[in-house]
Amino acid sequence: MTVALTLFDKIWDLHRIAQPDPDGEALLYVDWNLVHEGPFYAFDGLKRSGRTVRRPSQTLAFADHYVPTTRREFGSAAASDPEARNMIDQLAANADRTQIVHWGIDHPQQGIMHVVGPELGLAQPGMLISGADSHTTTYGAFGALGYGVGASQVEHILATQSVWYRRPRQMRITVGGRLAPGVSAKDLILAIIAKIGIGGGAGHVIEFAGSAISALSMEARMTLCNMSLECGARAGMIAPDETTYAYLSRCQFAPKGQAWDEALAFWRSLPSDSGATFDAEHHFDAGSIEPMVTWGTNQDETVPISGCVPDPATFTDLDRRARGATALEYMQLSPGTALKEVRIDRVFIGSCTNGRIEDLREAASLVAGRKARVPAIVVPGSMSVKRAAEAEGLDRVFIEAGFEWRAPGCSMCTGS
């Protein structure tokens, strides 16, 4: 009798090289290894040990975490922090020395790795993608297994094109119905985290399923998988479907001709089999979800915009009660305050979660004809997104409203 497999099972089996201990870690093959300016020490370690990058064509370097988003005509010299400048330059030097592909600060397709990779079609169903950044979970939107790795793992992957990984448990989150107008994938994932908690997905790979998930665009799916780690999950995944294939068909690095037909046949075999089992299940009704706002400092400290700041003293979980009290003090909020009455200090539109063209279109539609009353900046996720937005006149909408229009980078997420 054939065992019903999940999407994750299939990818795991395809990439497992060895597993000396059935209950221990497995050695997995890595299709793409993504690095940014931060893990320069991994390249230093290789150099000191006399080793080279095992497969340079499968390591991709992105200048994104510490690149300046203003005065870009000056290149890395525009970075006010000498350490940041050095890391940007080191990445370029390491990429040149090891012959890996590098989207540097002056590259016409420069941007945040988790925006550039998908828009170029580098992420494809069935792949295993590792990255020196926790939001590598983004690639799960394509039916790939994407996850972040630590310092020593980056060096190991550079040297071997493989990684030791303990098999996680599996969770399925099924979202039925449809999201209401004005409710986004960001609201959906915040509602999920608010329900299951920031540790609710710990030790699991999450597969998102259901009619509401199928109705999402690829960019919305990326937002969902990008934030799956915020509930402690090792990765978030969505089975590939016609929406996935249509998106990839337009991408630069997608297979072409006969290779496309062969890839498509393989991709169609990946969705979880009927009857496949999961270690945990959660169900949500998309129609009941409203726009969400985080009132604290963790993503599970979230309530609908129509709600009020809660009183942590009423929380039954002692850890959440303590965290909530600390968060309220930090945020200078009082229990019972209506969220709609809370003033904001500044606005940031961007990041690998929401710096894509759909996000900018949505934001511009709300900003048009209005004026910002607080400092506000918009940072497109990539140069391609920036050019597309400018071609549509979105930059003018933001600028006329008093927003700063900047160059791509991680920006406020990394303090750069």
At which residue positions do the language-model features occur?
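Fe-S-dependent hydro-lyases/dehydratases of central metabolism
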Residues: 1-416
